[in-house]
Amino acid sequence: MGSRLHLRDIKHGPPLPYHDDIRAFTKEYAESLDAQDPLRKFRDEFIIPSKKDLKRTVLAADENTDDSTDPRCIYLCGNSLGLQPRSTRKYIDRYLRTWAIKGVTGHFTPHDDQLLPPFVDVDVAGAKLMAPVVGALESEVAVMDTLTTNLHLLMASFYRPTQERYKIIIEGKAFPSDHYAVESQIRHHNREPSEAMVLIEPEDPKHPILTTDQILRVIDENASSAALILLSAIQFYTGQYFDIKTITAHAQSKGIIVGWDCAHAAGNVDLQLHDWNVDFAAWCNYKYLNSGPGGMAGLFVHERHGHVESKNGAQNEGFRPRLSGWWGGDKETRFLMDNNFRPQVGAAGFQLSNPSVLDMNAVVASLEIFSRASMEKIRQKSLHLTGYLEHLLVTYPLDAPPEEKPFTIITPSNPAERGAQLSLRLGPGLLEKVLEVLEEQGVIIDERKPDVIRVAPAPLYNTYAELSSSGIHIAYSSYNQYS
């Protein structure tokens, strides 16, 4: 609740301090904001590549060279891949040690100095830490598999097309893997995507934003034929944060199941998946949640879909069909090997195989940091951090008329409608030139050809001073190449 009140203050209260302060462009001003940052200590818990690191051609460290004083890069790409927590190595080393000295008995043998429970229970530890990040009950969350795999598993359970209801509503510019997953699910049920796939396209191609009213209108237009709506909580290209609560309630009032891809939202904004009554959701953990490339993902199933009571071994009418595997089975009977599937309650009952303990350690290493920082404080800082970057971009150089800007910010300007990411559409032919300048300055961002860059300050490790420098670099390089 705290960050929502904070958001309201930003929207309706006096301007943020840097809006009317000419000093906002100075290093000293940015450093004064950093000095007041309650999350500033967490930056030291991440390994930030140096400019020298980025140019390395070998991985082995030079033991004769002290690179601790090398300037760090400015890493604004946490929306693509988060940085490595320093604790990740400790977690993985402890796992490797357990495997080395215990072998298979490591599944059940506790240790006084363990960071995670024995192998058989690591998924429980992951779910416990993940739940508050996405606003869920612990029983509603499972850390498992990968994002697209989990979307397929969830749609296999929740997409139950009938003769009357068979359509899936999705963004026209959804992340390609989501698009492919929906297409293949429709074909799996012997239907054609051209008939069963409803694409919500931007009304104005120059402004690729989907308004809530537009989404609700599409829901109304397909109310009698849609079985499922699957949207991104935060749109990967524009950075738009959709009104999950309103859209979910409206679609459900029409009898439509609602799922959300939270890849760009988990660890970024303060989600409340349980309170918003979301049917299901899935996300990856390697972006803002820093679990490493291709790291283990997560899924959410609302508690009302997780009941598994049975009588005489038979599942009751409320049991939600799913693709099943032994790790989703009840722990008390899992090793009986009697081929009688008794699922765990909640999201855990959707698990298939035993999880990779190696990957789980990488996830938990980062989640432990989130548990100490809290999503409320992370979101509060993010609102200010992204707002500061936006201010620098739209006002620098001070004497430049707005109509002469060599870029357009296509992310909504309303803080309630975005997370940490700002997407900039550059003028024709500027992309490669701007990227070259930023690379030389050690500024790491993300590109989406032919003309968009995505800049994402992560509250746990980015600073106002970095944004002061990088924001001016971006604006200056754009103008310099444009003029």
Swiss-Prot record:
One Gene Ontology term from the biological process aspect of the record: L-kynurenine catabolic process
Functional note: Catalyzes the cleavage of L-kynurenine (L-Kyn) and L-3-hydroxykynurenine (L-3OHKyn) into anthranilic acid (AA) and 3-hydroxyanthranilic acid (3-OHAA), respectively.
Domain of life per record: Eukaryota
Protein name: Kynureninase 1
Family, per entry: Belongs to the kynureninase family.
Alphabetical keyword list: Cytoplasm, Hydrolase, Pyridine nucleotide biosynthesis, Pyridoxal phosphate
EC number: 3.7.1.3
Gene3D superfamilies, alphabetized: Aspartate Aminotransferase, domain 1, Type I PLP-dependent aspartate aminotransferase-like (Major domain)
PTM sites of type N6-(pyridoxal phosphate)lysine: 287
Coiled-coil ranges (or none): none
Keyword Hydrolase: yes
Localisation: Cytoplasm
GO molecular function: kynureninase activity; pyridoxal phosphate binding
Natural source organism: Aspergillus terreus (strain NIH 2624 / FGSC A1156)
One Pfam family matching this protein: KYNU_C
Subunit structure: Homodimer.
Cofactor field: pyridoxal 5'-phosphate
Residues bound to pyridoxal 5'-phosphate: 147-148, 175-178, 232, 261, 264, 286, 326, 354
Catalysed reaction equations from the record: L-kynurenine + H2O = anthranilate + L-alanine + H(+); 3-hydroxy-L-kynurenine + H2O = 3-hydroxyanthranilate + L-alanine + H(+)
Hydrolase listed as a keyword: yes
Pathway: Amino-acid degradation; L-kynurenine degradation; L-alanine and anthranilate from L-kynurenine: step 1/1; Cofactor biosynthesis; NAD(+) biosynthesis; quinolinate from L-kynurenine: step 2/3
Broad class of the protein's primary localization: cytoplasm
GO CC annotations, alphabetized: cytoplasm
